[in-house]
Design a protein with these regions (language model features):
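NTP-binding/hydrolysis catalytic cores, primarily Walker-type P-loop NTPases
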Residues: 189-214
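Inter-motif core of Ras-like GTPase G domains
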Residues: 95-114
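Conserved C-terminal guanine-recognition region of P-loop GTPase G domains, centered on the G4
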Residues: 120-135, 146
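P-loop/Walker-type NTP enzyme "switch/lid" segment
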Residues: 2-3, 7-9, 13, 22-97, ...
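Hydrophobic positions on the alpha1 helix immediately C-terminal to the Walker A/P-loop
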Residues: 18
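Beta-strand-loop-alpha "switch" segments that mediate conformational coupling across diverse proteins
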Residues: 149, 159-188, 202
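Hydrophobic anchor at the start of a short beta-strand
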Residues: 32-33, 84, 139-141, 169-170
Length: 214
């Protein structure tokens, strides 16, 4: 059993995209998954409602207004599913901290712009706070280079910039048309464009996260 929180203090960095597609890839590895959407705007729920694929079966909203109740529900889900994903909204530090306090792994997507790096630093501080409160062992914290344009200098240097913040960096996810098109249909990339570069990137990321959990 593992609880995986995807957090960040800035919007538009791919948190929901990574949550959805990483959960899909974990399911293909044989895991029973649950996906929790804590965003008041219900981004993942809205995505799932666009189609009748994987997300429509596994995404559920969960209110964080009452932390004790939230914790109880997450733990209950974790007993039924061996990979529980928590997608947190941007700019809501309380929700992100709450998720991090429950998580085995905190994933921090970050884009290549200077503002993205600053936001990643803030998200890292919060994740480390959660780890300190839990005795310094968990959650494991990893950056994910997200929405990367590999042909630009910013894109090429993103992994290095994130490593400089002091935590390990997982394989990147590129800025891919297939990702956006899949979301418009309510599907994950694996469902929409199996065998695509985007799908392969998420498969590689899932294997890296799986190794971390083991």
């Amino acid at each position: 059993m593992a609880i995986i929180a995807i957090t960040g203090q800035k919007g538009g960095i791919g948190k929901s995209t990574i949550t959805a597609n990483l959960a899909m890839e974990m399911a293909t590895l044989g895991h029973k998954v649950a996906i929790i959407d804590t965003d008041p705007q219900k981004s993942l729920v809205s995505w799932a409602e666009l189609g009748e694929g994987f997300l429509s079966k596994y995404v559920q909203p969960l209110d964080t207004t009452h932390p004790v109740t939230f914790k109880q529900k997450v733990i209950a889900l974790a007993k039924a599913a061996d990979r529980v994903f928590i997608d947190t909204p941007p700019g809501f530090a309380d929700q992100a901290l709450l998720a991090a306090l429950l998580a085995d792994v905190v994933l921090l997507p970050a884009g290549p712009s200077p503002l993205d790096i600053l936001a990643a630093r803030a998200a890292l501080t919060l994740a480390r706070d959660a780890r300190a409160r839990r005795g310094g062992k968990k959650p494991f914290v990893r950056f994910i280079p997200s929405r990367v344009t590999f042909y630009t200098n910013l894109g090429k240097g993103l992994s290095s910039s994130l490593e400089d913040l002091g935590e390990k960096v997982l394989p990147p996810i590129g800025q891919r048309v297939a990702i956006a098109e899949a979301a418009l249909t309510g599907l994950t990339v694996l469902e929409y464009a199996p065998g695509s570069v985007a799908s392969e990137e998420f498969a590689t990321l899932a294997k890296a996260v799986e190794e971390l959990i083991k």
